[in-house]
Amino acid sequence: MTLRFWFRRKAVILLQDKIPLLILLSVGAAFTAVWLALLRKRLNMAWYVAIMIAIAHTVYGVLTVKAFAFLETGFDKASLGNMSLFGGMFLMPLAYWLGAKISKRPPKEVFDVFTPCMVFTVMCARVNCILSGCCCGLPIPGTNGIRFPTREAEIVFYLILLAVLCPRIWKERLQGRAYPVYMMCYGAFRFIIEFFRESDISGLFHRAHLWALITLLLGVSIYAEMKTSKSKPRRRKQS
């Protein structure tokens, strides 16, 4: 009886600790569901399919950030509860590409439509960092313990990015370039903000600097390739 009570108490404590994260993930899933439902004609999907995809999108997103955190620490078991937002950046496109191929939807449309969903979800994850007290900024010299508001700055960055991307995606202006734009902006922002964030690695450059630089370069490369291929004249078939 004592052992059962101990397990029940541990389960209650664990659930209480996860309640803020679960609420934020629910908010992220709700945003994704509404956004997909509004743009369902672009992907030729029913509204109830949009809800199911929103839930799957959120669950897969959580798995990617946790898996990447476990990977970048050299499979350290102590990092199993950690999250790395770069996991979503690098692994979510795999789901988008596979989903487009399996459902026979245009990949450009899929990436454009799902980019705001990705941005909003990682924004919710960063809000959770504030609530859980992790990913803090460095102390500001001479301020008696006040830290750089790196997490808050990142949330503002996401809001501005959503305000810029969503109207353009709605009006179909980006033509598949939404995700590389997100990669370029996020890579540049994270590379700069990491100089003001605490890290488990001593020195000026953190592990996140590398991932941010890779993200930036990949975004620039993909964006440039898409612009180049769009500007190339199509060859007419000779009869």
Regions found by a protein language model. Give the residues of each.
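Hydrophobic, membrane-interfacing alpha helices
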Residues: 2-239
